[in-house]
Structures are given as C-alpha cells and as structure tokens.
Amino acid sequence: MGLSDLIAGGMDATAATELLLNVVWTIVGATLVYFMQAGFAMCEAGFTRAKNTGNILMKNMMDFVLGSLFFFIFGFAIMHGTDWNGIIGIKGFFNPTTLADADGLFNGLPIGVFLIFHTVFCATSATIVSGSMAERTKFLAYLLYSAAISIFIYPVTGHWIWGGGWLAQMGFHDFAGSTAVHMVGGICALVGAKILGPRIGKYDKEGNARAIPGHNLSIAALGVFILWFCWFGFNCGSTTAASTNLGDIAMTTNLAAAAATLATLVVTWIRYGKPDVSMTFNGSLAGLVAITAGCDTVSNYSAIIIGLIAGILVVFSVEFFDKVAKIDDPVGAISVHGVCGFTGSILVGVFSPEYTLKTQVIGVLSTVDYVLVMAIIVFTIIDKTVGLRVTKEEELDGLDIHEHGCSAYADFNFRL
C-alpha cells in the first residue's frame, strides 16, 4: 500500500510516512546484503585455483537458492516463530506470513520485508563455509550442508540472539551478526575443513605447510571491495528503520575496517618482509566482521581499537590454523569470520558501557557449543553417506571438469 492507502486506512500520516521510509531502507539493506554473495564468490574464486572457479561460483549461488527456500519453509519459523522456553520458535512453518499481526506487520515491518532481510543474512552465514572447503568437496555434499545450516543451525542460535530467545532475554548484544552470522559460519567452516582434510600437496611429508596460490588477486580484490561496500547495508540495514544513527553505524563500520587493514598490512610487512596482499585483504574483512556486533553501541575510537585487534589477530590466527592445527583453509574464512566474529562479540562487553563482558562471553560460548556439535553431526553424517571429498583424480584435474563438465576459463591457458 502507498501513503494515501495507509492514511485512508486510518493510520496517522506521520506514522505512515515513517513506515514507508523504514520499508524502503530495509529493502535497500537487504539488496546490499544479497550482493555480498557476489563479493564472497569473487574472493573465493580469486584465492583458489582456476580449475575450481566454476565450482566456487555454483556453491555461492546455491547457498542463496537453498537458503531462500529452506529458510522460508522452516528456518524463519524456528528463528522468529512463537518462542518455546527461550530455545526455539514453534510457529510459522511452511507459511511464515501467518506470524504477521492483523495489519500484516511483524516487528514493525510488513512481514515480507522482515523475512527477506533475514533470508539474505541466512545465506551469508551459509556461504562463509564455501571457501574453507574449496577445491576438494563434493558438490552434492556441499548442497546437503547448505540446506542443514539454513534449516536448523543458523535459525536456532538466531532465535536465541534475535528471536527473543534466552540470550536476548539475558541481554546479549550482537547488533548485526558477528556471532549470529559470521561466527556460526566460521565454526561450520572449521568443522567442515577439519573433517574434510587438507588439499593434496598442502603439506609435505614432514607436515610443513606449503602455499597454494590463488589464481587471480584482481578478482579477490574486487570481492573485498564489494563486501566492504555491501557491509554498510549489512550493518546499517540492521536498524530496519531509517533512523538518525545510521551515520554513526556507518562510521564505526568503516573505521574498524580501515584500522584492521592497516594493522594487517603492518604486521605482515614486519613478519614477512613485504606487505602481504591477500592477508591484507583478509584484514579488511576481519575488521568488518569484528565491528558488526557492536557497531551501534561503541565509539569511533573504540571501533578503531577493535579493528586494530582484529587486523593483528587475523594474521596469527591464519598462521595457527595453517601451520599448527594443520587445517587447510584456502581463503582464511575460519580466522576472518570465526575467530574475529568471536573476538568482536566479546569486545562489545569491553568497549560498550551498556553491555557486560560476562553476558557476551556466555552468549558467544553457548553459540560455539551448539554450532560445533551440530556441525560435527551434519558433516559426519554427510561424510558417512554420500561422502564429503572428491577422488584424488577429480581433485587434481579440478572440480569444474568432474563436477560440472565445464571450465570457467575454457579459452585461456594459464602460465605462472
């Protein structure tokens, strides 16, 4: 309905105008978050080898496709349906529009607007895992995981945090999803990569890590720029209202990302003798992930400090998983989303006067516990049934040919 229709229906003109502005802003935010799929696709494709590019693109596409369908049918009801003991939603399955009030609103917005905004968030959490399991995962196995996270992993912890569940009642604060979106995806990435095992050639006989360079830093850089741009929709859009604090949220988001980028650049320059390109790009994302939980409540200088911490932490985290834990993560998603999502959520309790460190720690650790257990169950079942990993021949030849019968660069010959 337009403004005149709302007024004719008895709504105050000011309230009607505010509602329409909120609708427009939330839809803008949702479209920006949707376009993050393109950013993730470019990052993952650029940081991996050319022979697997088509597979990367297909996985990112299917994360959104499956997320849209399964979150609509099951996930939204679990996340935002009528609360049952603070643990899970129990109403709205198969038709989430039944959760709307008599005016068709849910949480102050038309139900469709609220639903699409959380749908794109669900797809974002799912797609984080793609890069960590890249270059050796069966396509069917990945589709099964993507459906699982959209149905009963992301929505359950999402209910705890955003759906009126026990963490929300306790006062846990995760404004735009450092925990609910990014850490959930990062934990799933950790479990998936661990069970899957490293790529062929990643470690020598002595267990020393070898670099497997991505094929296109230009594409990876484009992905980072897209993600940084879309993150303004991710964080600012989480107000689901055209409010005056949008500028503050945008500023803390940008400052944290900038500080993290600079911190990563300096650390890699010191440790490696030269500023590392791919690690610096991941530093940008680390800062964005870390600030997402508290972008609405911390000061500008606190945002800079959070960014600096994330930018430094991501370097050592990537090195730890690569060299100590021996978990092969081609794009660094475990560190960027899992570790920095965890850290950013904790730091809300340090830098925000409104929220306590104790509550933030409880919220983060409880989410880790649930997601870790469910991810282990899901990936183990998939591995024991259809199998997680492709054959040695398929991995060496590339997944594009064996999984999809095509090549992303059919007319080009690559030479290093």
Where are these regions (language model features)?
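Hydrophobic alpha-helical transmembrane bundles of multi-pass membrane proteins
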Residues: 2-416
